[in-house]
């Protein structure tokens, strides 16, 4: 579920900072106009019946100008989509703030239902 929470946070952060409308591509990517803008990976360590820790890795193509030929048809960046560079710090701040909000609600309610109908990441 943390992968989906992170995806929702990425989509909300990008929308807030850039005005673009990315969508979540189940289960761990975000896309703009069908092209991948972000990948999310989670890794969990467990011990018996408990979770020791979870690491969430988020990679957003921010100011990438070109991609290798083998992925150039399926990948994009915020710079390519906007036509100009984007400052990373405000984007990181927006994503982290959204993640904190979504994660708090997820923990409070115990499932994703509370997020699906209220988030910026839901389909329009």
Regions found by a protein language model. Give the residues of each.
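Long, positively charged amphipathic alpha-helical accessory segments at protein N-termini or as interdomain linkers
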Residues: 4-22, 32-119
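Gly/Ser-rich oxyanion-binding loop with an adjacent helix/lid
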Residues: 25
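A short, hydrophobic C-terminal helix/tail in secreted or cell-surface proteins
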Residues: 120-124
């Amino acid at each position: 579920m943390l992968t989906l929470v992170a995806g929702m946070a990425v989509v909300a952060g990008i929308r807030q900072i850039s005005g673009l409308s990315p969508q979540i591509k189940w289960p761990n990517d975000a896309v703009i106009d069908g092209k991948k803008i972000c990948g999310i990976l989670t890794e969990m360590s467990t011990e018996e019946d408990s979770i020791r820790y979870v690491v969430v890795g988020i990679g957003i193509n921010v100011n990438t100008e070109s991609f290798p030929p083998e992925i150039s048809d399926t990948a994009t960046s915020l710079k390519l989509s906007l036509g100009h560079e984007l400052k990373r710090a405000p984007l990181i701040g927006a994503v982290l703030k959204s993640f904190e909000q979504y994660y708090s609600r997820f923990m409070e309610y115990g499932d994703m239902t509370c997020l699906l109908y209220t988030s910026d990441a839901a389909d329009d």
